């Protein structure tokens, strides 16, 4: 069982490393954030199932709700930046005057 947690932790670290490397493009940053949230969701679900925490079964679902909200806001921002400037560079975000 520890191999599963090791793989999930490596998936989280790979997504974090991708976030640090490809931070200039908004689409790459959003994909890396989704990978981080997916690995956190699976890790919390497996931990709750293995340790038999019956009172905290809602934590992975709450995490998915926050991930969906983050994805919706990120995609709306991506559409707004790409329609305005034609590029998805993060440096264009401070040029938006909302």
Curated annotation (Swiss-Prot):
Its EC number is 7.1.1.2. This is NADH-ubiquinone oxidoreductase chain 4L. Core subunit of the mitochondrial membrane respiratory chain NADH dehydrogenase (Complex I) which catalyzes electron transfer from NADH through the respiratory chain, using ubiquinone as an electron acceptor. Part of the enzyme membrane arm which is embedded in the lipid bilayer and involved in proton translocation. It is a multi-pass membrane protein. Its main location: mitochondrion. InterPro entries: NADH_UbQ_OxRdtase_chain4L/K, NUOK/Mnh_C1-like. One of its GO terms (biological process) is ATP synthesis coupled electron transport. It is an enzyme of class 7 (translocase). Pfam families: Oxidored_q2. It catalyses: a ubiquinone + NADH + 5 H(+)(in) = a ubiquinol + NAD(+) + 4 H(+)(out). Keywords: Electron transport, Membrane, Mitochondrion, Mitochondrion inner membrane, NAD, Respiratory chain, Translocase, Transmembrane, Transmembrane helix, Transport, Ubiquinone. GO terms for molecular function: NADH dehydrogenase (ubiquinone) activity. Core subunit of respiratory chain NADH dehydrogenase (Complex I) which is composed of 45 different subunits. The chain crosses the membrane at residues 1-21, 29-49, 61-81. It is found in: Mitochondrion inner membrane. GO terms for cellular component: mitochondrial inner membrane; respiratory chain complex I. It comes from Cephalopachus bancanus. Belongs to the complex I subunit 4L family.
């Amino acid at each position: 069982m520890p191999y599963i947690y090791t793989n999930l932790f490596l998936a989280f670290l790979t997504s974090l490393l991708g976030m640090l490397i490809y931070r200039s493009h908004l689409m790459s940053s959003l994909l890396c954030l989704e990978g981080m949230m997916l690995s956190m969701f699976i890790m919390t679900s497996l931990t709750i199932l293995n340790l038999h925490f019956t009172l905290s079964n809602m934590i992975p679902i709450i995490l998915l709700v926050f991930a969906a909200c983050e994805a919706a806001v990120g995609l709306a921002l991506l559409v707004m930046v790409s329609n305005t400037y034609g590029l998805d560079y993060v440096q264009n975000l401070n040029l938006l005057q909302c």
